Structures are given as C-alpha cells and as structure tokens.
A protein has these predicted regions:
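Bacterial N-terminal signal peptides that target proteins for export
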Residues: 1-9
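Short beta-strand motif characteristic of blades in beta-propeller domains
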Residues: 31-36, 71-75, 109-115, 121
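A short beta-strand motif characteristic of beta-propeller blades
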Residues: 49-56, 89-94, 128-133
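Structural motif
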Residues: 38-44, 78-84, 118-123
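Repeated scaffold domains used in trafficking and secretory/extracellular systems
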Residues: 22-31, 57-70, 96-109, 136-138
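N-terminal, post-signal-peptide region of Sec/Tat-exported proteins
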Residues: 44-79
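Bacterial N-terminal signal peptides
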Residues: 8-17
C-alpha cells in the first residue's frame, strides 16, 4: 500500500510540472487587424471571421492607429474610433473644441486615447468608450 501512495504523489507532482502555464492578458492572441484604405477604416475580427468597415467623413483622415488582442483604436482630426473583435462593432467619441491627442494605445481588450483634457478607454468586452476628465485646476 505504501508504494502505491508514493506513486500517486509522484503522479500529482509530475502533472503540476507538465501542465501548460496559465495564460494572462499579455499572452492574448491577436484576433483583430486594422487597415485604413479609400476613406474607410476596415477591421477584421478573427472571432467573428468577418470584416467591418467604418466610413470616414469628407476630408477626414486617420492620424494614428493601433491594434492588439481584441481591440483596434484610431483617431482622426475629429474623433476617436474603436473596434471590438468580440462584439464585431465600431464605437466613436467626438473630440471637443481645443482637444488634442497626446497618446494612443491598444493592448489586449483595452484601447486608450489620452488627450490634453481627458482619458478615453475602450473595452472590447463591453464595446463602449468610458472617459475620465482631467481636473485642470490642479
């Protein structure tokens, strides 16, 4: 009986060392691709297995874009745009007067656009923008 117990302990320890590592958001597969072409933004969702397009206005051009994981973000002179590979939908947030973009980033399920007056965050899971306005009186 005693040797059987040792055998099961050995099997349990071997399973711990052989099992695959836990995957964190940094290891998230890229499921989205973003392309700017012919006055449109085109996003491909690997999860939905389809392309989705967003028309740009007359004279509107993409200044900068980024994509990673399940999210793609871009901005033009007029608005912030984001695509969720999970929902397969676009969302937009118009810029305010005298608002200038300082940074743009896509990582995992989150896209961010930081401006001189607020931080915009887009969740690929929810498919919506959330803002935090900076207190300019500090």
């Amino acid at each position: 009986m005693r040797s059987t117990s040792y055998f099961f302990v050995f099997l349990a320890l071997a399973a711990v060392f052989i099992s695959p590592p836990i995957s964190f958001s940094d290891d998230l597969n890229n499921e989205v691709y973003l392309l700017s072409k012919n006055n449109k933004l085109l996003a491909f969702s690997g999860l939905q297995n389809k392309w989705s397009e967003k028309d740009l206005g007359t004279g509107e051009t993409v200044v900068k874009s980024d994509y990673d994981g399940n999210v793609a973000v871009a901005y033009t002179q007029d608005r912030a745009l984001a695509f969720s590979g999970i929902t397969g939908r676009w969302s937009e947030e118009r810029f305010r007067i005298h608002e200038t973009v300082e940074s743009i980033k896509a990582q995992g399920n989150v896209g961010t656009i930081i401006t001189n007056i607020r931080a915009l965050a887009f969740s690929a899971k929810k498919g919506i923008w959330v803002e935090s306005v900076f207190d300019i009186h500090d």
